[in-house]
């Protein structure tokens, strides 16, 4: 196992440990964590944010090292998207109901709507299924720019939710609008829309690969 693949694999292990840790914290009765000053940022969520940023960077790092050192392997190609989806989708699910998965974050006002999570996770399931079908026919479905943009926007939106709309809430300290009209909320909506568009593009661009065996 080369270095880029080790980095990818370590991201999977770290994500699993994070999920288990957050679950354990969620079942500790009476646990509450302070905020960072007057920022409304929960300290546990801040730690998760730091981990998420580092993990997101390793997603870029392992691919860069693999291409630079000519260490691209089939195992790396398989593990990289698995690591990405495990990291992003687990955080999407965790943040869709912070009062359920993180009852210690009593002041958390930012979250990801359930319908957004359903769209983004369903999109990944559909695209992965299509890729599997195409691979069985010897067809490789390449990532498109919308797919890459989708991942970046998801990571930005997740980061904004973890920081509880910081620093955007300083723009409207006495915001008369509901939370679903905040800057963070629109980042989530944009990521959801891009995810849906990229999924449609994958299906349309590669539809011939799925129709060939019917001829």
PLM-predicted stretches and their roles:
Residues 1-215:
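Alpha-helical transmembrane bundles and membrane-interface segments of multipass inner-membrane proteins
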């Amino acid at each position: 196992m080369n270095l880029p693949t080790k980095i990818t694999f370590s991201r999977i292990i770290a994500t699993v440990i994070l999920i288990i840790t957050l679950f354990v914290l969620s079942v500790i009765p009476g646990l509450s964590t302070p905020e960072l000053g007057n920022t409304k940022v929960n300290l546990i969520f801040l730690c998760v944010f730091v981990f998420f940023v580092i993990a997101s960077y390793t997603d870029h790092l392992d691919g860069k090292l693999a291409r630079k050192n000519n260490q691209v392997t089939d195992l790396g190609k398989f593990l990289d998207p698995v690591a990405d989806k495990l990291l992003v989708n687990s955080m999407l699910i965790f943040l869709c109901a912070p009062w359920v998965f993180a009852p210690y974050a009593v002041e958390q006002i930012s979250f990801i709507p359930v319908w957004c999570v359903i769209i983004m996770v369903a999109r990944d399931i559909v695209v992965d299924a299509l890729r599997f079908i195409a691979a069985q026919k010897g067809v490789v479905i390449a990532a498109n720019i919308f797919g890459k943009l989708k991942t970046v926007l998801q990571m930005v939106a997740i980061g904004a939710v973890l920081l509880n709309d910081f620093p955007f809430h300083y723009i409207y300290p006495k915001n008369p609008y509901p939370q679903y009209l905040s800057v963070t909320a629109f980042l989530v909506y944009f990521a959801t829309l891009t995810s849906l568009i990229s999924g449609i593009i994958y299906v349309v661009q590669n539809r011939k690969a799925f129709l060939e065996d019917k001829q």
